[in-house]
């Protein structure tokens, strides 16, 4: 699949099959993430954690459910049944917000690579926020001291055919 086609086809998958992605595909997705632009080239300010363990998913789901209930007053299951999750954590950046931009670039590259490989994906922040606020999960996921989980991506094969939505963003062109 060509790059622009993968970008156009990428959509958020919210229901996955149990089938695990291959190690080769996982490595390709990681390579794409590590090829992302990072402010000032500070790649060492980022850390990637891969989770493929159902027991840990249960703990993450419980923490996410608790966090969402606190924030929104309702229960939601947010793992989407994905067999792989990748968390990207960051040290605080020198410029405000740069850690969020860096993380987003890494995960968008991963999402486009996954789409090109026929792997469904969704980038989301709830699990990263839940891990950030849970010392036990931070320890289980071996998040290094001084790093904060920013976002994660769930990966797997979609349980249904995904049709990308058309999105519009207001554009001003100044000449």
Regions found by a protein language model. Name each.
Residues 65-66, 102-104, 139, 169-170:
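Short, solvent-exposed amphipathic alpha-helical segments in soluble enzyme
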Residues 1-82, 175:
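N-terminal amphipathic, basic helical "cap/leader" segment at the start of enzyme domains
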Residues 50-54, 90, 157:
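A general secondary-structure junction signal
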Residues 84, 117, 149-151:
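Generic beta-strand structural signal
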Residues 5-6, 12-13, 148-175:
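C-terminal helix-cap and adjacent tail motif
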Residues 137-148:
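Short, electropositive alpha-helical surface patch
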Residues 33, 86, 92-138:
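Small-aliphatic-rich amphipathic alpha-helix that forms the alpha element of a beta-alpha
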């Amino acid at each position: 699949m060509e790059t622009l086609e993968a970008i156009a086809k990428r959509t958020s998958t919210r229901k996955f099959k149990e089938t695990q992605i291959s190690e080769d595909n996982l490595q390709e997705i990681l390579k794409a993430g590590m090829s992302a632009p990072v402010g000032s080239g500070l790649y060492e300010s980022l850390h990637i954690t891969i989770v493929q363990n159902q027991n840990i998913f249960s703990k993450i789901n419980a923490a996410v459910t608790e966090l969402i209930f606190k924030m929104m007053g309702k229960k939601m299951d947010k793992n989407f049944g994905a067999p792989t999750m990748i968390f990207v954590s960051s040290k605080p950046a020198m410029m405000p917000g740069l850690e969020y931009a860096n993380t987003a670039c890494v995960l968008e590259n991963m999402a486009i690579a996954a789409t090109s490989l026929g792997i469904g994906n969704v980038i989301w922040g709830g699990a990263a926020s839940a891990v950030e606020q849970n010392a036990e999960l931070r320890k289980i996921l071996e998040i290094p001291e001084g790093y904060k989980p920013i976002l994660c991506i769930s990966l797997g094969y979609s349980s249904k055919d995904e049709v990308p939505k058309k999105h519009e963003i207001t554009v001003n062109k100044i000449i």
